[in-house]
Swiss-Prot record:
Cited Pfam families: Kinetochor_Ybp2
Subcellular locations according to the entry: Cytoplasm
Function per UniProt: Involved in oxidative stress response and redox homeostasis. Required for hydrogen peroxide-induced oxidation and nuclear localization (activation) of CAP1. Functions probably in concert with GPX3, the actual CAP1 modifying enzyme.
Annotated organism of origin: Candida albicans (strain SC5314 / ATCC MYA-2876) (Yeast)
PANTHER family: YAP1-BINDING PROTEIN 1-RELATED
Biological process (GO), any one: symbiont-mediated perturbation of host defenses
GO CC annotation terms, alphabetical: cytoplasm
Subunit structure: Interacts with CAP1.
InterPro entries per UniProt: YAP-bd/ALF4/Glomulin, YBP1/2
Deletion consequences: Leads to decreased virulence in a Galleria mellonella model.
Coiled-coil residue windows: none
Membership in a protein family: Belongs to the YBP1 family.
Protein name, as recorded: CAP1-binding-protein
Gene: YBP1
Keywords associated with the record: Cytoplasm, Stress response, Virulence
Length: 643
C-alpha cells in the first residue's frame, strides 16, 4: 500500500504517469492472489489516492477500468445487498470518480473496448444466477462510465462516438444470445439500453465552435442531430431483435390461451404475458417517431412483391425448380434487406432492424385483443411466414425463435379476423393461393414445430394451428402430410404428424368453412354479430376422407416404418423409431371402423401379421427390458385393432 501511495507522489512530481500505470498493473492484474479482506484494503487505498489527486486520476484513469472489472467476481452468495459483495462498493465509487475527474475521451474509448469484450462467465462450477449477477455489475459499471463520459466529450461530430457505443453494445448483445442467459439477465441489459436511449443528450460543442461560420456550424449540427437520431432508432430496434433471437414474450401462446378461454372446448393451459416491460420500448419507439404500423404494412407489401414474377404454373419447370427459385429469392432478400446491421455493408446508410420493428408492432397489437386492425389476410400471413422462416430452413445461423412466435401470432390473427370478424370463406380464399406457396407455408410451420422441442405447450398450439389450416385445403393438405411422412428428415416429428392426420380423418365438420373457431364467444369489442349456427340438416363429413388410394399410401408408410423400427433381422427395436410405428398402429385402431378399412381388411391383415411376426422375433431374441416392454406395448395395440 505504501508503494502505491509513494508512487503516486513520485508520478505527480516527475510527471512520469506511465510508470505509475505500470505499477498499478503489477498490483492489480491478478485478483486471485488476494483474500477478500486484502482486496477491500487495496481497492480502498486506490479510491483514496484517486479522490485526493484529481490530476493523477486524469492522467492514469483510462487504464483502470479493465483492471478493476476483474475484482467484481468473488465468492459472494448474494444473500444481502450487492454493496456487501467484496470490493464492489469501492469499485463503483472508483468508477464514479473516473467519470468526474478522468480524461473523458480516453476513458470512453477504453470503456467501449471493454464493453465489446465483456461476456457472461462460462464457468459451470459457478451457479448461473451468480454469474449473471456479476455480469450485470460489470455491465453497469462500464456502461454508466461510457454514458457519463459521452456527455462530457466536446465534439463537432458526436455521431462518431455514439456509433462506437452502439456498436460495442450490439456486439455484447450478440454474444449474450449465444450464451442463453435468463430472462432476468436480458431485462437488466435491456433496461440499460432503454435508459440510455431515453436520456441521451448530445455532447457539447467544442469551445472554439463559435469561430466557425454560422451557416457551416448550423449544417454540421443539423446533420449530426439526424445521424444521432438514426443511430438511436437503429440501436433500439436492433437490440429488440437481438434480445428476441432465443424467443419473444410469448405472443402466439398467449393468444391461443385466450382462444381456449373464449371457447367451449376444454382448456389445455392458461398463459398470460407481463407486457409492461416491452410497453416502454413501444412508447420509446413512438417518441422517436417510428411509425410501427407503417413499418409492418411496408413489410407485408414488400413480402408480396418479393414473390411476384415467379410463374407457379409454368409447365416447363418442375415443382422442385420453382421451389428452388422461391427459396433463392427469399434467402437473398433476407440477407440483403431483413437481416440488417445498423450501418449497412456499404457504410452509406443507417438502418433500423425490420425484425425489431415487427416485434415491437406485434407487441403493441397482441395485448389489445382487438382484431379489426390491421387488415391481415391468410395470404398476408403466408408471405410473412415464408419471408421470415424459409431462410432459417436453409441456414441454421438464421434460426430465430422470436420470428417463430411473431409469424405464428399473425397467422392466428388472420384466421380470427377473416373468419370470425369478417365472416370470410377461408377455404375459398386459400384456394386462390398457388399450391407451391401453400405447401411451402405448411412446411414452414412444420419446421417451427420441429424447432419447438422442449416447449410442449407451444408445440401443441402449433399442431392445432397446422391442423386448422390443413382443413382449409384438404387435397394440398393430404399431399403435404404424405410427403412429410415420406421425406422429412426429422423422425421426431412423425408421431405428431400422424396425430394430426388422425384428427383430420376422425373429426367431423358441418361445412367446409368450419375450423372450430366459430365456437368462440365473441366479445362486443370484436364483433356484434354472433357466430353462425350449423345448418339444421347438415351432413356430417370428415375433414379428410379415407379412400382406397390414401389407404394404399398409409399401408406403404406403415410398411416402411416397420422396416425402420425393427432392425438386425428383426431381433431389436430402434428406440428412435418406436414412437412412429406406435403412432401408426394407434391410427389404425382409431379408424378401424371406417368403411374403407372394413372393405380392405385382408390387405391390413397381411400388414398386421408381418408386424406381429417381427414383435415375436424381438420377444424371442432380445434380453433388453426396454425392447421387451416396447414389443408388449405394440402387441397390445394390435390386439385392440383386431378386436
Amino acid at each position: 500500500m505504501e508503494n502505491l501511495e509513494s508512487g503516486a507522489q513520485d508520478a505527480l512530481q516527475s510527471k512520469d504517469f506511465l510508470s505509475y500505470s505500470t505499477l498499478l498493473d503489477i498490483y492489480l492484474n491478478d485478483p486471485t492472489k488476494y483474500s477478500n479482506e486484502e482486496k477491500e484494503q487495496l481497492l480502498g487505498h486506490i479510491l483514496t489516492i484517486l479522490s485526493e489527486n484529481k490530476q493523477l486520476t486524469y492522467e492514469i484513469g483510462w487504464d483502470l477500468p479493465q483492471l478493476l472489472i476483474l475484482y467484481v467476481d468473488s465468492d459472494y452468495e448474494f444473500n444481502g445487498p450487492i454493496r456487501d459483495s467484496p470490493g464492489v462498493y469501492k469499485i463503483l465509487k472508483i468508477f464514479e470518480n473516473l467519470a468526474i475527474n478522468g480524461n473523458h475521451k480516453e476513458l470512453f474509448l477504453k470503456s467501449c473496448e471493454l464493453l465489446n469484450d465483456l461476456e457472461l462467465s462460462q464457468d459451470e462450477d459457478i451457479e448461473l444466477l451468480k454469474r449473471e449477477n456479476f455480469f450485470e455489475i460489470k455491465l453497469y459499471c462500464v456502461f454508466e462510465l461510457i454514458d457519463a463520459c459521452l456527455k462530457k466529450i466536446h465534439t463537432l461530430y458526436p455521431s462518431r462516438f455514439l456509433a462506437m457505443t452502439v456498436s460495442s453494445f450490439n456486439n455484447l448483445m450478440f454474444k449474450l444470445t449465444k450464451q442463453h442467459g435468463s430472462l432476468g439477465n436480458y431485462h437488466f441489459v435491456m433496461k440499460r439500453v432503454y435508459s440510455f436511449c431515453r436520456n441521451y443528450i448530445s455532447p457539447p460543442l467544442p469551445t472554439n465552435a463559435k469561430e466557425m461560420p454560422q451557416e457551416e456550424l448550423d449544417k454540421i449540427v443539423k446533420d449530426e442531430e439526424y445521424l444521432q437520431r438514426r443511430l438511436l432508432t437503429g440501436f433500439l430496434t436492433q437490440v429488440i431483435y437481438l434480445a428476441n433471437i432465443n424467443g419473444t414474450e410469448g405472443y402466439s401462446i398467449e393468444h391461443f390461451s385466450w382462444l381456449q378461454q373464449q371457447s367451449k372446448s376444454k382448456i389445455k393451459f392458461v398463459f398470460e404475458r407481463d407486457g409492461a416491460f416491452c410497453d416502454r420500448f413501444v412508447e420509446l419507439a413512438s417518441s422517436f417517431d417510428i411509425d410501427l404500423l407503417k413499418c409492418f404494412q411496408g413489410f407485408i407489401t414488400d413480402s408480396h412483391k418479393l414473390l411476384i414474377g415467379i410463374d407457379y404454373k409454368n409447365k416447363n419447370k418442375s415443382e422442385d425448380e420453382i421451389i428452388e427459385l422461391l427459396f433463392e429469392r427469399v434467402v437473398v432478400d433476407y440477407q440483403k434487406n431483413v437481416l440488417t446491421s445498423i450501418v449497412d455493408s456499404d457504410a452509406k446508410a443507417i438502418k433500423d432492424s425490420i425484425i425489431g420493428e415487427l416485434i415491437l408492432f406485434t407487441h403493441s397489437i397482441a395485448g389489445k385483443k382487438n382484431f379489426a386492425k390491421p387488415t391481415m389476410s391468410i395470404h398476408d400471413s403466408l408471405v410473412m411466414t415464408l419471408r421470415l422462416i424459409i431462410p432459417q430452413m436453409v441456414n441454421p445461423k438464421f434460426i430465430n425463435a422470436g420470428n417463430h412466435d411473431v409469424v405464428v401470432f399473425w397467422v392466428w390473427f388472420a384466421l380470427y379476423q377473416q373468419q370470425i370478424i369478417n365472416s370470410k370463406n377461408l377455404q375459398l380464399e386459400i384456394s386462390y393461393i398457388p399450391k407451391v406457396l401453400l405447401t411451402t407455408f405448411f412446411q414452414c410451420l412444420l419446421f417451427i414445430v420441429i424447432k419447438s422441442e422442449g416447449k410442449p405447450n407451444f408445440k401443441y398450439m402449433l399442431l392445432t394451428l397446422l391442423t386448422k389450416l390443413l382443413t382449409l385445403s384438404p387435397d394440398t393438405g393430404y399431399e403435404f402430410i404424405k410427403d412429410s411422412l415420406n421425406n422429412c428428415p426429422y423422425e421426431s416429428v412423425y408421431p405428431s404428424l400422424i396425430g394430426v392426420y388422425k384428427q383430420l380423418l376422425l373429426n367431423e365438420k358441418w361445412d367446409v368453412n368450419s375450423i372450430e373457431l366459430e365456437k368462440l364467444n365473441i366479445s362486443s369489442s370484436s364483433s356484434n354479430t354472433p357466430p353462425k349456427l350449423p345448418p339444421r340438416n347438415g351432413i356430417k363429413r370428415k375433414h379428410f376422407s379415407l379412400t382406397n388410394e390414401s389407404l394404399n399410401d398409409l399401408v406403404d408408410l406403415i410398411n416402411n416404418s416397420s422396416k425402420n423400427a425393427f432392425v438386425e433381422d428383426n431381433s431389436k427395436i430402434d428406440p428412435s423409431k418406436l414412437s412412429t410405428i406406435a403412432a401408426y398402429l394407434n391410427l389404425l385402431v382409431a379408424i378401424k371402423k371406417d368403411p374403407v378399412i372394413v372393405e380392405n381388411k385382408e390387405k391390413l391383415t397381411t400388414l398386421i401379421s408381418s408386424i406381429e411376426n417381427k414383435i415375436k422375433s424381438v420377444k424371442k431374441s432380445s434380453q433388453n427390458q426396454f425392447e421387451l416392454n416396447a414389443a408388449g406395448m405394440l402387441e397390445i395395440t394390435i390386439e385392440r385393432f383386431n378386436e
